Structure formats: C-alpha cells, structure tokens
Amino acid sequence: MAQAQEDSDPIGSILIQVHEDLHQLKEKLVKFSAEETRSTLDIQNLETAIQRTEMGLKIHIDKYLGVVNQEVLMAPVKKSLESPVTSKWSIPTVIDQKSFIFPMDSDFWRPQKHRGSLLHGLRRAKPKIQLTTKVMQDPENKHHRAAVTASYGISLPHINQRKAQDKVQRLIKGSTISNLTVLPPSHRTDPHFIPIPVLQKDASKGVLSMIERGLIPPTARITFQNPPIKPQALPLHSFDEHRKVPMEASFPLALKPRPVPEEVEEPSHQIEIPKGRAKRSRGPLRRKGMKIRTPSKTRKSPWDYIFSVYNGCVDRTAPDFLAFKSRFKLIWGSIFSFLEQIEKFLKDYAISEAKIKGKSLVSLLPEFELKNKLTRNDVLAVLENPVHIQMLLNLPGQRYKGQDGKAEAATKIQATWKSYKARSSFISYRQKKWASGVIALAWLLHCHRTRLKRIVKESRQRHLENFRIRAQHLAANWSRIRTSRRTIIHIPSLGYSQYVRKHIFDLDVEQNMQLGRLCDIIDANVNVIYICSHPMTDELKLYYRKLLSLQAAVKTGYYGDRTDLQNRFRIITPEAVNVFTKHHMCLATHLMYSPKAIKRIKNLIRGEEAYIVGGILHRDDLAVADMLNVPILGSEPELVHLYSAKSGSKRIFDNANVPMPPGIYDIYTYQQMIEQLSQLVTDNLGIRRWVFKMNTEFGGNGTAFCDIPSHLQCYNWVLKERNRFGHEDWKKKWAQESALVKISEELAGILAQHVQLVNEKRFPTWRKFLHMFLTQGGVIEAYPPADSVTNLTVDMLIEPDGEVRVLSMGDQLHADGPFISSGTTMPQTSVDPQVLNSLCLQIGNICKEKDVVGYFSIDLVTFIDPSTLEQQVWTTGLNLSYSDQLAMTQLTLYLTNGHLNCSLSTLEVPRFTEDSERERKRLSIQAELAPETSRYAVMSTQLKHDNLSLIFYYVFLQMCKAHGIGYDLEDRQGTVFILYESLKRYKLGMLTIGVDLQGVLMTFARNLFIIHQEISAPDMQGETNFKTTIDDIETILGVTEENKMIFVREKQSKEEEDNLYEPVEIHSEIV
C-alpha cells in the first residue's frame, strides 16, 4: 500500500520511511550491551518513547492515507495562463499538522552528528509547510513563481497583465464516504461476465445488502440446510428427435378405465408439446402410439386428475388418485387435510358419490391453508358435479341423514329452542327498554316543558306588572306628556291567536295598511317611529317623504312652501321579518326578536318622553315595551281579546244599555244553539235573516247567514198561532211551546242545507264552519229587516286620564258583500250626530269602567224599521284597536289642515293663511268665488287588482297624473294613494277628498274606472274588487239622489204649509 502511494504522494513515502527507521533504531537499541549504556532505566524510558512515537505515526499514517484516498482536492484554474502546469501531486491541507507526535530528546541521539539540527528543522518545518502550502495553492501570490522554481525547478513564464477573475470562495470537495460496490445490471443477467470479488467492507454490510447490490445472486445457497425444492436444469429434447408417447392403458380393460400412463411418476417427462411443434410429429403419433381412442385412454394434464369419493371415502387405489398423489407429494400434507375435511363434509350430508377435481383442489389449497376450514361453496368448487350435489344439500333434513345425524338434530332442536327463548326474552326486554326510553324521554320533555312554561309565565307576569306600573305613570303624567315634546312608536300589529293569524291571507300586508299613522307629526311636538312589516324601498320612502312634506304647503296653498320633515319620522323594519317568513308571527313578535331594531329605537327615544300605540295588543307587545322601557297607550292584552270578541262586546253593550239586534252569545254546544235559535225565531218572527259570527274571526271570515223563515214549512202556521194568541200572550212560554217543537225539528236540516258562508275559501262547508264556531264560541244575531241598511264605524279614544273622546265616524262601503267593509265615507251622514255621539259615549264610559284604555272602534248599523217607519240604530261590534279608518282620517286631516267636528258630523277646512301679496293675487282671481269650508272624504284600504303588480309605482303615478288623478293644494281636494309594499303590489289604498258627498263618490268611482281600464286587457282581467266597489258607489249615489228628492219634496211641502198659515199670522199681527 505504501508503494501504491509512493508514486503519487512523497509525504506518504517519507512518513513510512520514518516509521521504518524508528523500527530499526528500536532493534539496534535492544542489542546494545549494558556497558555501552549509562543505565538500564534510561534504556527503558527510551524504548517506551519510541513505542509511543511508532504507534502515533502508525495512526496518523492510516489517517493520512484515508484522507488522500477519499478526498479530491481542486486547485483554482486561471484562464489567463497560456500553458498551465499541474503537478502530479499536491500537499493536502486537510492534514492536521498538530496531530503529529514526535519523539522526545534522548541521550541515544547525541552520538549522531546532526541530531540538534534535525530537531530544530522539525520544529521549524510546521510553519514553513503551512506557508508553502498556502503559496502553492494561490497562483496569483507573488511568491508562487519563486516557490515552484525552488521546489520543482520549473520556471514559469512571465505574465505582465492578468485578467480579473472572481475569487473562489471555497474548495469544491467530494463525498467523504466511500461508495459501496454495486454490480452493474449487465453483469446480473449475462452469465459470461466474471463475478466481482466480494471485499471485506462489502461483506461487513450484511448478506441482505450484498443481495440487493447484486454481489450475491438471488438464487445462491447461503445456508447449510437443504431447500424443499432444488433448482435444476430441465432436459430439453431436440426438435428433430421423434419420441413415442405411450398411450396404451396399464391396466386390464375389464377394470374401470383410468387415464394414468406409467410415465406419470417422472415429472421431468410430463412436458406438453407446443402447438407449433406438435404439427411436425402428428403423423408418427397416429401411426405408432394411438391404438385405442377412448376418453379414458386420452393423456391428461397433471392438473386434470379426477378421482371419486364413495360414501364419504376417497378411492385411494384409483390410478388418478395415485397419480395425483405422486404429482403433488411435496405438498401432500395440506392436500391430505383438505381431503379429510371434504370426506367429513360428504359424510355429514350423506352424499353417496362425488368426484373431486384435482385442479380445483390445488387452486383452493392456498386459501385453505390460510383459513384452515372449508365452506360449502369451497367444497362445491372442487367437485365435478356441483349442481347435483347442491340439490342434495338443499333437501330438507339432509344433514341429519349423515354421520351423527341424531346428535346434530338434537343439537339443532336445542339450539332452536334456546334461540327462541332468548329471542322472546330479548324482544320482551327490547320492548320494555323502548317503553322505558319513551317514558323517560316523555318525562324529560314534560319536565323541560314545565320548566320553560314556568319561566315564560314568570316572564309574562313580570312584563304585565311592569306594564301596569308604567301605565300608572303615564296616567299620572298624561296632561304634561301630551303637550310636551314626545315620540310615538306605532306598532300596527295584529295580535290575534296563532290559529287566526295562520289563516289570514298575506298577513304582512294586512299589518301595513295604517301608514296614515305617520301623520301624527301634524303636531309640532310629536316625532313618529313607525314599525313596518315590509322592507321599505327607497322609492316608497321618497314617496312618503314628499307626501308628508306638504304640511306647510297645505296651510298656505302654495306648493313652494313645502318643508322636509324626514327627521321627524322614522320607518323601521325589524330584521326578523326576513328570517321568520313562514311562521305567521305578528309584528310585535318580529320586533321582539330583532335586537338591531330595538337598539335603534332605544337610541332614537333616548332622553325623550315616548309611548307605544299598538294594534291588537299581544303579550309580545308587553315584552317589547319592557325592552324599550316605555308605556303602552292601550289595555292589557287579555282585556283586549276578551272584549274584542263578539261575545265580549255583547256584554259591554248589555251593560251600556244600548240598542242591539236580537240575538244570543256565548254559544259553545250544538244543543244550546238549536234551542236558543228556535226561541229567537219564535220571538222575532219578523226577522227574515239570522247571522252567525265567530268570536275571534274578523273581516267577515267567521261569518255565515241563513234566511230561516223562508225555508220553514211551519212558518205560516206559526204566524197564525201568534195571531190567534195575540201579541201580549204570544210572549208567554206556554203559548210558544208547540211552535218551538216544530221549529226545532226543522232547524237542523235548514241550517245544513241553506246556510250561506261569507268566506267559502276559509270555510267551504257548513260542517267545518260549525265545528270551528262551537270551538271558538260565537253569537247569533238578527239582520236588520229592511232593504236599505247602512253600517257605520266610530273611532274613539279613552285617554290615560279617563277622558273619552270621539275621533272619527264614517259610513261603510261594502264592495265584497254586506258583511265585509271595504272603505268608508267620512264624516257620516246616516244618523243624527247627537244620537250617535250619545250611544258611543255610553259605550265608552262602560269600557272605561272595565279598565279599557286607548283606541277602540264601534260598529253600528242603521235602517228604517218597516213596522214603525222610524230609524233604528243597533250596535253590532267592538274592536279595541287602532282602526284603518282612523289612520285614513289622520291622513285626511293632514292634507286638508281641517278639523273633524264629530258632534256636528262635519269636516271643516280653515281659510288659507297668506301674506298680503299672495292674498291680492288670489282675490283678483277668485274675487267673486266664496271658498267652501267643508269637505267630504271617501277612503279605502282594501282596493286590490292583480294587474297592479305588472307595473311599477312610478309608472302607475305617472299614469294617474296623465289622467288628472291627483291632489290640488289650492282647493285642498283630490286623490292620494297609500302604497303598502313594492314586491307584490296587488293592493293599495286610496283617499279622495271633495266638497260634497255626491261629488266625492263620483270622483272616487271615476278614478277606479280609469285605473281599471288602463291596467286591464280584454283577455287579462285579473281578480279585482274595483267593479264591485263602483257598483256599490253607484247604489249609494242612487239612494242619495232619492233621499235628496225626498228631502226637496218634504221641504216644499213644509214651505206650503208655512204659506197657508202666514195670512193668519199677518192678520193676527194687524189685529
């Protein structure tokens, strides 16, 4: 190894030479005699030092050679040099010069001549070697040329200019780990290559590593144990050699033929001949080998052995079995276990005969070795006739015909019985467990529901107590609050029961029809917050902002005097409206679940007096008031629902002692209804129609009527009986007894066949109506016995301090039938105002005694009694809520700057307040015209037309403007629309103001006719009530004209009477 390094690196040879010299020195020192040395002790020390030095040199020699063999040093190359000279060797810089250990000075070195100079040279060699190494590695060093010349005798050429080159930052070094020997792929497959010898360092990596690198062939024998299968070369025959394949049977023909040749024991001779080669020897085979052509004598492949099983035992003497056993003798242990299980299976099922296919058996053998058990499908897979065996296995009781059949049958019976008992017990246990789970769940739900009910009840009670406390505070400070700066929060919520709200068509639109509440800002001290049930678009907000800005212009009659009042009213939509879209919640509930809207309202009312004006109060109104910490101008929700019901209003009217139609209330059973209705018909034979009203329904939804006398067969007989007994005796029970029996017998059938329902969509049949009527309770009352009937609505207010005021009164319009109000004319002209005010104040005082506070409305009906020809007024309904008529009245007063005098039933409009210049202009134009100071209004919130949804509001208003439908500020008359929402747009409200009632009705009808003509096509009319409203107005106009003619005739007759008495008066005066 030293010789190998000597040619390339002199340092290695020098170190080895030093090592040899030290060894020779050691031998010579050992031979010295005792006389030539000073003492033995010094010789021992010197020998120890030499051994230590030798060991150190040996270690460093190995280290140096390892570094030189494993690292490649690269010196920087300079392209500017024309003829670079590279030495055959270089001094490695990675040698740790400090690691050399030199021997210490000894006396044995003194006899030598150059001992001191040698030690001194060795001491100076270390820095000199380092400096020389640095100079030799840097060709650009100024001492490089001199060092090369001094060391090697090479004179480098002079280079005057050098090109700038980037300095090499570090030496590029290779891997310090030697690569392992890997056999090339060509050596692994080609046997002609000589195998590479295995070195000790390769062997130290292990056998597996050498196999992976190809140093050891994969088929090499690396253990001393004999392998189960010995690989050996397969003998191949020449293509030209013809071999005779014996095809004769090796057994007598009398025995059962078995296709097993004698050569089957030699596996090396059982080779199939390829098809291409077999064609060449087909002739000789036919001539020499095939003597008998039978299926049993045809040669088979080793995988086609078929042997029989008789009565569950394999025929072990059969030639096929013997051949199969000989072929697979190396794995016979597994095959034997396989066959044992097949034999057991066939014995268990009493299969007398079966045939096993050796090919299938061997293919299933690996799977069997893994599972160590067979299934029915596995057994059938190795049999030659699986279909027949499958039929036998499927026979009932086949298992019990085989071995241990009785024991198996007994086991099966016991297992079936135990399974049945266990199954029965389990089913019983499961049922009990399910029942216990249901009971436990029901109990948990009951407890949870009870706890929630208790919490909700406590919360409701707390809200009610806070409501009462705030109501007392409102009553005590009402005189101050109503004249000071305040904010009114309008929540037009319909707080009916969940069942009623569920059947209200488009509940959100119904709760947004009172936008006239915004007109409360007519009072300069009032700000309004209106809670809207629909998201209000910018178009609608702009419309109402312009409409409400007309307040100052209405007072002066000049359009330029408009003022923007958008800071005095706010329209807020609760965010829960967009969340709970199909829950049929009232507006108060939506607001309660809208924290953002609540927070905004709190910010708007902070530091100001505020109170809530609701609709039909709900318990959630109290919750909202509790959140906002403001009072409600209204009654407790329980009182509202009690006295707003039909039966509750009858109690109020009874206590007020006001005239009511004959009837009964608080009906909850069918028997009660038949008995009391029979009594009513008997007592009031002059009433032709009877009306059925449910307690909690509104708008005619829970109303039905029947003309009972017209269908009574005994009606004429009852009239004769009444005439026979006389008017006074007929009121006695004994006189009516026979009539009651006959009427009761006919009444049930008449009601089932002849009752007419007002809203057939809501209640299509009498049976459904009757069921809900008896569930909710209701009233039965008489319909006025007259051809001309007028319904009235009077709005009133009971203030917190107890003052009762009449706010509005109007005559109803009935476009959709006599029991559904579609609008009103205001002020009313049907009843004497003094009589009407007296009745309403009586009812108001009774309501105040019942702790009713806030807004409410009274429904009345007036007609001419045919028997006395006198006008009658009946009270029919009471609603403790803010009505649509009152909201439209507020809008009318806002647009006219008028005053409604309910005691005189007049709407008075004051004259304009103008400056002198504007007044002179007006007087010059209308010098001879006396301005009218009274107005009439026709208002409706129930106008609907499907085709309205086809046009936008902007187009609709432009269309109306083109046809002259609008409002005149100077005359303070015209038409204004109430727009509810911008999505469906099939419904709107309209207010028409005029000088006289007849003219305003005609204007209202004309507007409807024009709108209907503009938005309707001949082939697309749509559902609308425009036509019926026009017809009703025409009927009213006809009655008005007739009444006017009657009034004129009466006036003329009175004047004639006065003229008749006038001469007498003159004569008396003269006298």
From Swiss-Prot:
Cellular compartments per GO CC: nuclear speck
Tissue: Expressed in fetal and adult testis, in the spermatocytes and spermatids but not in somatic cells.
Basic residues bias: start-end ranges: 276-286
Stored InterPro entries: ATP-grasp_IQCH, IQCH
Chain positions covered by the region annotation Disordered: 262-286
Protein origin, superkingdom: Eukaryota
The IQ domain, residue ranges: 406-435
Record field: compositional bias (Basic and acidic residues): 266-275
A GO BP annotation: gene expression
Biological role stated in the UniProt entry: May play a regulatory role in spermatogenesis.
Protein name as catalogued: IQ domain-containing protein H
Organism in which the protein naturally occurs: Mus musculus (Mouse)
Gene name for this UniProt entry: Iqch
